[in-house]
Each structure stands twice: as structure tokens, then as C-alpha cells.
Amino acid sequence: MMVCQGFTIYVVMTKANAVSGFLPSTNGLHFANRWEPGPTVRLGILDPRLVGVGDAKSGLCGGMSWFVRERFETGQPIPADATAPANGSPLFKAIVRRQIMSLDWMRIPLRFWRAAAMDPGALVRRTVEAEWPRIRAEIDAGRLVMIGLIRHHGTNPMQLDRDHQVLAFGYETESPTGPTTIRVYDPNWPDRDDISLQLSTVGFRQSTGEPLLGVICLR
């Protein structure tokens, strides 16, 4: 804020940053997070879908985000496939392995569950005051960061597949606590460089219209 000849002038200081060299259209997978029904893994003769888990049709957003980050950080080319690989193919198995890694021995689903169970207002405050600064620090350090999008409120663990994982690579913010735009690679929207999350102290939105109640920094 500045005062000049009796007038109060508010100056908005905008800061922007992004991971150098990363764009979803170039470095992201070129197919959408849409998979045919089928088991992601088998436990011996057991099909895990019989107990309500492990169906590819529920999505592999965590594995896709992890795969993209790993390829970028190691300088490996991204596969040119424009359609999701078949169940059991080498690329499918590679993404599934990283999906399992993204769950961090089930610690990540627990974090999603805790966030979804929070009072909505408390989740907004936690996102702005705790999670967003961690995301920003990772990007400022030049690192892609996986983040979780909370899209439902409640305590039913069977609803966790409504939530989502994406990869943040840039931001623009007007102050340490927002309003803020986070640029993301979203596995549901391949080859799009314009997907973003808008955060403020009064609520959140995703540029593609999906509900967004909160954000958590994963790793």
C-alpha cells in the first residue's frame, strides 16, 4: 500500500514461478486417465476386484502423475501412445507399479480420508495456510510436486475414488495466502497446458469445472 497526495494506492505484488522446461503437452502422457474394467494386479488366484479394490476403471491418476514426474526428472522420453495401454502391457504395468508407490503404504488414502472428513471451512483454511506453502516451496525449488484434490466431503472410505491426484508445475500468486493459480498436469485432460486450480480464502475451483473442496501436498 502507498499513500500519495491524500490518495491511498494499493499495489498488488504478483509472483509467478514454474518448473523450467515442463509442459503437459510435451512432457505429460498423451492419453486420458480412462481405462477398461479389469484388475490392476492379481494376488495369486484372487482377483482383488472381488473385495472392491484394484479395478483399473476407477483410474490410475497417481500412477500416471508419478510416471510423468519420474520421466521428466530422469530425462527419459514420454511414450507417444495416444490411447491408454492394454491391461497387462508393459506400459500399463509400469503405471500400476507407480500407482501403488503413490499410495505410500496406504498413508496417502488416509490423508485423503482425513481431509474429506474435515469441516469444509477448516479444509479451506488448511489448504491456504499449510498445504499451499508446501506446494509453492517445491515449485520454487524447481521440483514437480504431486498434489491431491479433495472433491467430496464425508467419512465413507468407499467414496475416495471421487478424489484425484495431479502434478503441479507452476503458479501465480498475489500474496503468500492467495488468491493463487496453480498450473497442473491433470491425467484426465491430456495435452492441455491450460489446466489450473484457483485458490482463495473463500473457496476453490478447477478450470475444467470439477468440484474442488481442498488441496493436499503429497510429495
Residues covered by each model-derived region:
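Short, positively charged and aromatic/hydrophobic N-terminal segments
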Residues: 1-2, 7-10, 15
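Short loop/turn segments at secondary-structure transitions that flank enzyme active sites
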Residues: 37, 67-71, 153, 172-174, ...
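Cys-His-centered catalytic/binding microenvironment captured across papain-like cysteine peptidases
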Residues: 158-163, 172-219
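Active-site-adjacent substructure of cysteine-protease-like catalytic cores
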Residues: 124-184
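Cysteine-nucleophile protease catalytic domains, especially the papain-like/related folds used
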Residues: 18-129
